[in-house]
Design a protein with these regions (language model features):
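Helix-loop junctions and terminal segments of transmembrane helices
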Residues: 1-25, 29, 79-83
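Interfacial segments at transmembrane-helix termini and the short loops linking adjacent helices
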Residues: 22, 39-72, 141, 177-183
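Residue-level recognition of pore/gate-forming positions within transmembrane alpha-helices
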Residues: 23, 36, 45, 69, ...
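Short alpha-helical transmembrane segments in multi-pass integral membrane proteins
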Residues: 27-39, 114-138, 152, 156, ...
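Membrane-interface junctions at transmembrane-helix termini in multi-pass inner-membrane proteins
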Residues: 66-95, 105, 110
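Alpha-helical transmembrane segments
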Residues: 76-85, 133-149
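Hydrophobic alpha-helical transmembrane segments in multi-pass integral membrane proteins
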Residues: 101-106, 158-175
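Membrane-proximal transmembrane or re-entrant/amphipathic helices at the cytosolic face
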Residues: 141-144, 168-225
Length: 225
């Protein structure tokens, strides 16, 4: 992927680069949101079947783990920073490591496992969601950072909207499959994945031009094969 992005940047077409960046970003966010929705709804029941309810995490730690997974899956700026050759930012990994370790130790002391995970998340938010996109926009794209903030805010609103619609659907329309064994759990999981995947796909397709371009590109490449 880094090589492909590097070739695109070498062409020097800023509009094309930004268009691909938005497609790449929104597609990663959509995929991460679907995966995390399924993790949130299905992990506890799977662990109960696998090792028993005694090994379930507390709700706070579990939610923080899902948030961490989402952040880890949506770090789209790193590939473009590498492709632009912006290697002068040597202090970001050091600051991230210091924040990660320091916050995890302090918060872990007071809040246990939830504090440790929270410390990791805070360090990622500062560096991966704060500094790195700012660095990319100012030194790579050479555009105002507020454009990134507005676009990510729009994506997060679409994720929240899709989550709300899916929650209402599961609460009032479809109660799911009764999970008394692992076979029923698999059927239930596939249903949850399919339903939320379709709902979120429709929300993203309706409200985001870059996501529509990504879908058209995907089917175009699929038809070529």
């Amino acid at each position: 992927m880094n090589a492909s992005i590097g070739n695109l940047i070498a062409e020097g077409n800023k509009d094309k680069i930004l268009s691909f960046f938005r497609e790449y970003t929104v597609s990663r966010y959509w995929l991460a949101s679907v995966i995390c929705f399924c993790l949130f709804h299905l992990s506890h029941s799977f662990i109960s079947f696998w090792v028993g309810q005694d090994y379930l995490l507390d709700s706070t730690s579990f939610v923080l783990l899902v948030i961490y997974a989402f952040i880890a899956m949506t770090r789209t700026n790193d590939s473009f920073i590498v492709a632009y050759g912006l290697f002068q930012d040597v202090y970001a990994p050091v600051v991230e490591a210091i924040l990660n370790l320091g916050l995890s130790v302090v918060l872990g002391y007071y809040y246990g496992l939830a504090g440790i995970i929270g410390g990791v998340i805070i360090s990622l938010l500062f560096i991966a969601y704060g500094w790195k996109p700012y660095f990319l926009y100012s030194c790579g794209f050479k555009l105002p950072f507020k454009g990134y903030i507005l676009y990510i805010s729009k994506i997060l609103l679409m994720i929240i909207g899709a989550y709300g619609i899916s929650q209402c659907f599961f609460m009032y329309v479809w109660q799911g499959v009764l999970c008394e064994n692992i076979g029923q759990w698999i059927i239930h999981s596939l249903c949850v994945l399919s339903i939320h995947g379709i709902i979120s796909l429709c929300v993203f397709f309706l409200f985001d031009k870059a996501f529509r371009s990504f879908i058209y590109r995907f089917f175009y490449l699929l038809n070529r094969k």
